[in-house]
């Protein structure tokens, strides 16, 4: 089943009218929290040996949750753990709740949880899953830019350059998950920007097909392409550092 809800909004609406902003959290704090819980999810997914697609799904689910729920009322790390648990089931790489909770605690605190702490957190995840699913209206199947990037590179770039470009573009897609781009643009539009920046980083150029630029295949306008590229690159000049994880 394809995505059925319209989860996309403008950057202005996301930054000014999110539930967290309406509850008094300023933009810098909300951006910081997004960095923090997405970074946590990336590390958690890697520790669980989850595929990158599962990690990306967890991050998008978590970001979508906070378009409808406030950071003031929901602990972002707990929601993130729940989203990783759900994403594993959605993407065919399920892990028992206990495994997800145990590894999460190790990532957050760099030690094993006491038995009672473990059981409380596990119960919180299992009961909190209902709130997350309800908030997301069980709309859980997400298309990511990775396959779009890979298919286009295979068609358009010779093998030795293609591998280099594909990896560069994947890196930009992964990093973009720390921004709100997945709430603003579809996977094909994000894929086009990741390829565009990847081409520049790899010092590669592609000819236009007459008057049609290659990126028009991705249903993206030039203005959208520049906007996505700008936001991707802005990511690398943020004026804060994500701290050590912790609940």
UniProtKB/Swiss-Prot annotation:
| UniProt keyword Cell division, yes or no | yes
State the Gene Ontology terms under molecular function.
Answer: cyclin-dependent protein serine/threonine kinase regulator activity
The Gene Ontology biological process annotation of the record reads:
cell division; regulation of transcription by RNA polymerase II
What keywords are assigned to this protein? Cell cycle, Cell division, Cyclin
* SMART domains named in the record: CYCLIN
Q: TM spans, by residue?
A: none
Which top-rank group of organisms is this from? Eukaryota
Q: Which InterPro entries match?
A: Cyclin-like_dom (IPR013763), Cyclin-like_sf (IPR036915), Cyclin/Ssn8 (IPR043198), Cyclin_N (IPR006671)
Q: Which family does it belong to?
A: Belongs to the cyclin family. Cyclin T subfamily.
Q: Indicate what this protein is called per its UniProt record.
A: Putative cyclin-T1-1
């Amino acid at each position: 089943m394809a995505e059925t809800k319209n989860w996309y909004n403008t950057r202005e609406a996301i930054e000014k009218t999110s539930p967290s902003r309406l509850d008094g959290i300023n933009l810098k704090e909300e951006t910081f929290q997004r960095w923090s819980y997405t970074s946590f999810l990336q590390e958690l997914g890697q520790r669980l040996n989850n595929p990158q697609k599962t990690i990306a799904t967890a991050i998008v689910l978590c970001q979508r949750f906070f378009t409808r729920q406030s950071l003031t009322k929901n602990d972002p790390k707990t929601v993130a753990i729940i989203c990783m648990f759900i994403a594993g089931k959605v993407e065919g790489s399920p892990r028992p709740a206990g495994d997800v909770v145990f590894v999460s605690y190790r990532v957050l605190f760099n030690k094993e949880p006491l038995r009672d702490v473990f059981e409380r957190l596990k119960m919180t995840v299992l009961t909190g899953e209902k709130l997350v699913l309800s908030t997301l209206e069980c709309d859980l199947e997400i298309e990511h830019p990775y396959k779009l990037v890979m298919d286009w590179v295979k068609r358009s770039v010779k093998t030795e350059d293609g591998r280099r470009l594909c990896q560069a573009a994947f890196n930009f897609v992964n990093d973009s998950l720390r921004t709100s781009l997945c709430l603003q643009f579809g996977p094909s539009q994000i894929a086009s920007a990741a390829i565009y920046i990847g081409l520049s980083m790899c010092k590669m150029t592609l000819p236009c097909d007459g008057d049609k630029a290659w990126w028009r295949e991705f249903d993206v306008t030039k203005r959208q392409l520049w906007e996505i590229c700008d936001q991707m690159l802005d990511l690398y000049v943020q004026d804060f550092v994500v701290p050590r994880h912790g609940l």
